[in-house]
Amino acid sequence: MDKERTLVLIKPDGVIRNLVGKILMRFEDAGLKIVGMRMFWADEEFARKHYREELDERYKEVEKKYGRNVRNELVKYLKEGPVVAMVLEGVDGINVVRKMVGSTYPNESAAGTIRGDFAHISKDYANAQNVMVRNLIHASEDKSSADIEISLWFKDDELHSYKTVHDIVCFEN
């Protein structure tokens, strides 16, 4: 299995709740390497590039059920405050990160996942309040999404290769 890179965003609610350090520590403790990181406050145009139009198809069922434009709500949520964007690298990195993050809906996330431990708003509560589920974090869904998202959030020269102790112990003979 090759090392993969994936984009992770700590969304405004995670930043505002001072969870950045705790979340970073979990990824590093799992042997994932931070190869790029920055804090950014997304504007409308940038948020719409992240939540790109081709993702609208995924949200059709939610829109039917709740009568809300999911993409517009996600864009609004991403613009609410600063975001910490990072690129993580590791063996099977995309799947490892997604497993650590947990379900999209915090109340459905297992204990021990980032959302299961730090987020608590259910989709029913969020819908009753007419807000997006505050789920703290975004992680690329697959290799294709990771490639698109990484190139949106980072230039090539902002991503770095280096060895960690984990690399030396686990990957060098």
Predicted regions and their residues:
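Non-catalytic terminal and connector segments of soluble metabolic enzymes
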Residues: 1-173
